[in-house]
Amino acid sequence: MSSIYLGVNIDHVATLRNARGTKYPDPVHAAEVAERAGADGITIHLREDRRHITDRDVRILRETLQTRMNLEMAVTDEMIEIALKTQPEYVCLVPEKREELTTEGGLDVAGHLDKIKAATEKLTAAGIKVSLFIDADREQIDAAKACGAPFIELHTGHYADAATEADQLDELKKIAAGASYAADLGITVNAGHGLTYHNVAPIAALPEIYELNIGHAIIGRAVFDGLHKAVADMKAIMVAARQ
């Protein structure tokens, strides 16, 4: 079986810091701990309203990360310019609404093909690997291919939020089919959103999945067990699922 990689999203360390307007806990420190615990990359979402990760965080993390930065961002001129200046290894283009608590669904690539293709081409020309955060839908996967994106990240939120085991199994089948279809097109497949210690194994077991991006569950577990153990435990579950 191929390896599977873990990108640790540290947004909610910044959420905790910003709740009191303090300098702690510092997501830069969190990234260091996560890397030592086995994270293969660090994911951060610089939102337009800067509700958690800030420009300062992006700048310092770019200088200090020992693994790779995956910068999640909306498809706006401001964010594209920040990415071009920062030069992260990866950019994941995501939909964004100011009123949402977290990203609610996949990017409608098919409905905004020209705009997303232009952004993808601009970032790619700068040497940045582009991923598109989409639902496991053939139309969206085809559109991602048409944009020239080498990566997609399949939205696992519907799987994670399924009300029954039967519904969850249906969502897993959709993700598995989408991952297989994308891989056949030559696209590298990541996945994430809503994954926890209890539901991650079936997703991690899918052979086409290259990397999982997980944040909220890890930071939540870290409150009780410490961040190092929380990251290491998640990585262990993922690796075991691939055996």
From Swiss-Prot:
Keywords attached to this entry: Cytoplasm, Pyridoxine biosynthesis, Transferase
UniProt binding sites for 1-deoxy-D-xylulose 5-phosphate: 11-12, 47, 52, 102
Site positions per UniProt: Transition state stabilizer: 153
Enzyme Commission identifier(s): 2.6.99.2
Keyword Cytoplasm: yes
Similarity comment: Belongs to the PNP synthase family.
PANTHER family registered for this protein in UniProt: PYRIDOXINE 5'-PHOSPHATE SYNTHASE
Name this polypeptide is given: Pyridoxine 5'-phosphate synthase
